[in-house]
């Protein structure tokens, strides 16, 4: 696995536009409802987390693997949401990148995340 394209649908009782992504995911009512992904251009798979389905282990592992490039439209949102999801549901697999100088800690490293929204702005 070299690339994974990701799209999520989420819910929170916190207004994203008023409070931003960090407060949005910190709500105890935050949840990821749907997790869509495609590995290396293969067929899209959709995991209905709200219906009790689980993300496959190889995909969970890929989320913390910096050698796997993660692609998403507005990847910052996906990265922060998935960080919170991993922290809650897979704490044994969650790896944060925080350094002492970082004021926003406990999130997945942005190193291997690519934003298609940003890339499309250059086209």
For each feature predicted by the language model, list its residue ranges:
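Conserved DEDDh/DEDDy metal-dependent 3′-5′ exonuclease domain
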Residues: 2-5, 10, 15-19, 23-123
């Amino acid at each position: 696995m070299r690339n994974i394209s990701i799209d999520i649908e989420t819910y929170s009782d916190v207004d994203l536009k008023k409070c931003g992504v960090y407060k949005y995911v910190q709500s105890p009512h935050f949840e990821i409802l749907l997790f869509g992904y495609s590995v290396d251009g293969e067929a899209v798979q959709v995991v209905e987390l709200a219906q009790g389905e689980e993300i496959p282990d190889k995909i969970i592992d890929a989320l913390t693997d910096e050698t796997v490039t993660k692609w998403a439209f507005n990847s910052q949102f996906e990265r922060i949401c998935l960080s919170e999801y991993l922290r809650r549901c897979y704490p044994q697999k969650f790896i944060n990148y925080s350094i002492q100088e970082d004021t926003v800690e406990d999130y997945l490293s942005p190193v291997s995340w690519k934003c298609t929204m940003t890339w499309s702005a250059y086209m």
